[in-house]
UniProtKB/Swiss-Prot annotation:
Alphabetical list of InterPro entries matching this protein: CHAP_dom (IPR007921), LysM_dom (IPR018392), LysM_dom_sf (IPR036779), Papain-like_cys_pep_sf (IPR038765), YSIRK_signal_dom (IPR005877)
Signal peptide limits: 1-49
NCBIfam families: YSIRK_signal
Role of this protein: Probably involved in peptidoglycan hydrolysis.
LysM domain mapped to chain residues: 175-219
EC number: 3.-.-.-
Protein name according to UniProt: Probable cell wall hydrolase LytN
CDD domains: LysM
Cell compartment(s), UniProt: Secreted
UniProt enzyme class: hydrolase
Keywords, in A-Z order: Cell wall biogenesis/degradation, Hydrolase, Secreted, Signal
PANTHER family attached to this UniProt entry: LYSM DOMAIN-CONTAINING GPI-ANCHORED PROTEIN 2, MEMBRANE-BOUND LYTIC MUREIN TRANSGLYCOSYLASE D
Length: 383
């Protein structure tokens, strides 16, 4: 009985032990689960904290990036203003110069996203100007350059090494010309290679035909063409001209009537001269007919007046029918360039003032303008 009781007790103890063991296992399991959940929760919190930190870092980086971009844009504008302030622009003569002795041509534009580079320099190309705003230091350097421009060139002024530009389109320089006796605006304009209207506008002259001796005029600073050295005439030509002039002096201040009719006519004086050369007078109803009524093949050469023609002493000059009441006029040349401009000549005339028919006007010197319809007859023989 005792044994049975003990056995039963043993069985009960064993069962209780199993129950306690089971409870302990359950407790351990619950504890393990709790610890695991706690650890898992801690790791989750840590991961969440890490995510929050990363999010804060991202937000901070984004704000810094936005700030950096705004600062970069501000630096770009500042840089552009700096470049504009450092560049001195001369609008006149379309020229530019830089304070650091750098020149930028008008056609070059400074871009924001450019890079400084030193391009090898050759005869046709200078250094390139490039700017980089993406450099860490945000500094802009301008290289020395020579801008290529076909209408401009480099200038050195005195001892100062100045690099700039000037336009070839400069205002014409002028000089002062004093009006002299016999001057005209057209002659002055021709002398200084300009126009009458230009001289009028420069000097505020209303009437181009009215200028005064001693008047000061502004004329272009044109280098005057030096006169060509005059060729020394041969002794024979000089002697012949002298002999002709000496003979013509004997005709001066006297009245001549070669044909005995109508007093001292212009035709009479010329016939006296031609008879002295060739032993006969000239034919013609009027003075204007002389070139056409006579055969000059063996005695003279006929010239029609041109702007460059110069008469010689001893030449006959024949005026057209516009003179002498339709009969024309004739005279003997003494000086073919009386005014030094081939505009006037001097001759020995008779009856120029219509006093010959009364024998009241002797042969005398007269200065004439070259007329476009004049004819000159140059004898081969000299007096």
């Amino acid at each position: 009985m005792f044994i049975y009781y003990c056995k039963e007790c043993f069985v009960m103890n064993k069962q209780q032990s199993k129950v306690r063991y089971s409870i302990r296992k359950v407790s351990i399991g619950i504890l393990s689960i709790s610890i695991g959940m706690f650890l898992a929760l801690g790791m989750s919190n840590k991961a969440y904290a890490d995510e929050i930190d990363k999010s804060k870092d991202f937000t901070r980086g984004y704000e810094q990036n936005v700030f950096a971009k705004s600062e970069l844009n501000a630096n770009k504008n500042t840089t552009k203003d700096k470049i504009k302030n450092e560049a001195v622009v001369k609008t006149s003569d379309t020229s530019l110069k830089l304070d650091n002795k750098s020149a930028i041509s008008n056609g070059n534009e400074i871009n924001q996203d450019m890079k400084i580079s030193n391009t090898p320099k050759n005869s046709n190309q200078g250094n390139n100007l490039v700017v980089n705003n993406n450099e860490p230091t945000k500094e802009i350097k301008i290289a020395n350059l020579e801008a290529q421009n076909s209408n401009q060139k480099k200038v050195n002024k005195g001892t100062n090494n100045y690099f700039g530009y000037y336009s070839f389109r400069e205002a014409p320089k002028t000089q002062i010309y004093t009006v002299k006796k016999g001057d005209t605006l057209s002659a002055i304009a021709l002398k200084y290679k300009t126009t009458v209207s230009n001289i009028q506008n420069t000097n505020n002259i209303a009437n181009p035909n009215l200028i005064f001796i001693g008047q000061k005029l502004k004329v272009p600073m044109t280098p005057l063409v030096e006169p060509k050295p005059k060729t020394v005439p041969s002794n024979n030509k000089s002697n012949s001209n002298n002999s002709t002039l000496n003979y013509l002096k004997t005709l001066e201040n006297r009245g001549w009537d070669f044909d005995g009719s109508y007093g001292w006519q212009c035709f009479d004086l010329v016939n006296v001269y031609w008879n002295h050369l060739y032993g006969h007078g000239l034919k013609g109803y009027g003075a204007k007919d002389i070139p056409y009524a006579n055969n000059f093949n063996s005695e003279a050469k006929i010239y029609h007046n041109t702007p460059t023609f110069k008469a010689e002493p001893g030449d006959l000059v024949v005026f057209s029918g516009r003179f002498g009441g339709g009969y024309g006029h004739t005279a003997i040349v003494l000086n073919g360039d009386y005014d030094g401009k081939l505009m006037k000549f001097q001759s020995l005339d008779q009856n120029w003032n219509n006093g010959g028919w009364r024998k009241a006007e002797v042969a005398h010197k007269v200065v004439h303008n070259y007329e476009n319809d004049m004819i000159f007859i140059r004898p081969f023989k000299k007096a």
